[in-house]
């Protein structure tokens, strides 16, 4: 018998943007199929006054409290207040900081939002995001050779969201749609530096996605053909043949999240893999 779905409050307190905390909280919550977290996110909490207001909200809607607050005084207030309310509190970063301190033999500086300083890495990500927007959906200016990776695939194989995710990691990504009957831009075959990767999925999966999303700029397909599984299978065969012919690695995204697809591409980049394969 299937257990009924239950809901719980998940409070996330951060002295920075909260992105790290949110990722950790969602990763943990995903392990519980019959429970759904009602997320309460409190970013940029850096004063006791701000924190006290947050704690009032937690008292009104008790639940698990996760926090990334480097100020030890504020961290102590969180732990003490949560203990008084009878709710669990966990410092997500503290075990990691303790391990670093033990290994490096030096204490952490404990600066809020230290990972978000405007350094070279930050500007590299901004540059990659701008590059991605200029090279999305088949836009291939003459500077395509600057790309780290070019993603190809038929419609609805998550090319654009994967490109955005990679750009957020500082990777310059372009993407090109493969449409049956429409020639692939010649500039793609001339590219020497970028890793070119093909994304595919099952016809069933793509049909399901296409039925729930508009066609967009697909001039050679009407609505019926766009969602028809037989037609999609032909598109996929064309895409696979093209990738195999040119030695481009193929990644099946049918059961992959955007993050997992991006991780597979990052692994290919890291290994310098340019031979045709399927994963």
UniProtKB/Swiss-Prot annotation:
<keyword id="KW-0418">Kinase</keyword>
<keyword id="KW-0808">Transferase</keyword>
<dbReference type="InterPro" id="IPR026565">
    <property type="entry name" value="PPDK_reg"/>
</dbReference>
<comment type="function">
    <text>Bifunctional serine/threonine kinase and phosphorylase involved in the regulation of the pyruvate, phosphate dikinase (PPDK) by catalyzing its phosphorylation/dephosphorylation.</text>
</comment>
<dbReference type="GO" id="GO:0043531">
    <property type="term" value="F:ADP binding"/>
</dbReference>
<feature type="binding site">
    <location>
        <begin position="153"/>
        <end position="160"/>
    </location>
    <ligand>
        <name>ADP</name>
    </ligand>
</feature>
<keyword id="KW-0547">Nucleotide-binding</keyword>
<comment type="similarity">
    <text>Belongs to the pyruvate, phosphate/water dikinase regulatory protein family. PDRP subfamily.</text>
</comment>
<dbReference type="Pfam" id="PF03618">
    <property type="entry name" value="Kinase-PPPase"/>
</dbReference>
<dbReference type="GO" id="GO:0016776">
    <property type="term" value="F:phosphotransferase activity, phosphate group as acceptor"/>
</dbReference>
<dbReference type="GO" id="GO:0004674">
    <property type="term" value="F:protein serine/threonine kinase activity"/>
</dbReference>
<keyword id="KW-0723">Serine/threonine-protein kinase</keyword>
<protein>
    <recommendedName>
        <fullName>Putative pyruvate, phosphate dikinase regulatory protein</fullName>
        <ecNumber>2.7.11.32</ecNumber>
        <ecNumber>2.7.4.27</ecNumber>
    </recommendedName>
</protein>
<dbReference type="GO" id="GO:0005524">
    <property type="term" value="F:ATP binding"/>
</dbReference>
<dbReference type="InterPro" id="IPR005177">
    <property type="entry name" value="Kinase-pyrophosphorylase"/>
</dbReference>
């Amino acid at each position: 018998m299937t257990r009924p779905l239950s809901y719980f409050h998940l409070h996330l307190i951060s002295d920075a943007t909260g992105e790290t905390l949110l990722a950790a909280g969602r990763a943990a919550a995903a392990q519980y199929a019959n429970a759904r977290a009602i997320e309460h996110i409190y970013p940029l909490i850096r004063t006791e006054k701000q924190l006290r207001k947050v704690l009032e909200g937690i008292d009104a809607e008790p639940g698990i409290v996760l926090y990334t607050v480097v100020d030890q005084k504020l961290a102590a207030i969180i732990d003490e207040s949560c203990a008084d309310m009878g709710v669990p509190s966990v410092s997500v970063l503290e075990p990691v900081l303790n391990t670093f301190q033990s290994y490096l033999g030096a204490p952490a500086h404990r600066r809020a939002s230290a990972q978000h300083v405007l350094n070279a890495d930050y500007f590299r990500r901004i540059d990659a995001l701008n590059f991605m927007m200029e090279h999305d959906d088949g836009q291939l200016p003459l500077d395509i050779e600057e790309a780290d990776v070019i993603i190809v695939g038929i419609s609805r194989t998550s090319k654009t969201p994967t490109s955005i995710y990679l750009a957020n990691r500082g990777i310059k990504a372009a993407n090109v749609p493969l449409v049956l009957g429409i020639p692939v831009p010649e500039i793609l075959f001339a590219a020497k530096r970028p890793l070119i990767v093909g994304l595919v999925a099952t016809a069933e999966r793509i049909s399901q996605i296409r039925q729930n999303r508009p066609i967009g700029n697909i001039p050679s397909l009407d609505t019926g053909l766009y969602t028809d599984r037989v037609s999609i299978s032909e598109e996929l065969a064309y895409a696979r043949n093209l990738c195999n012919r040119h030695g481009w690695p193929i990644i099946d995204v049918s059961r992959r999240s955007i993050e997992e697809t991006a991780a597979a591409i990052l692994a290919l980049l890291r290994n310098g893999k340019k031979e045709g394969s399927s994963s």
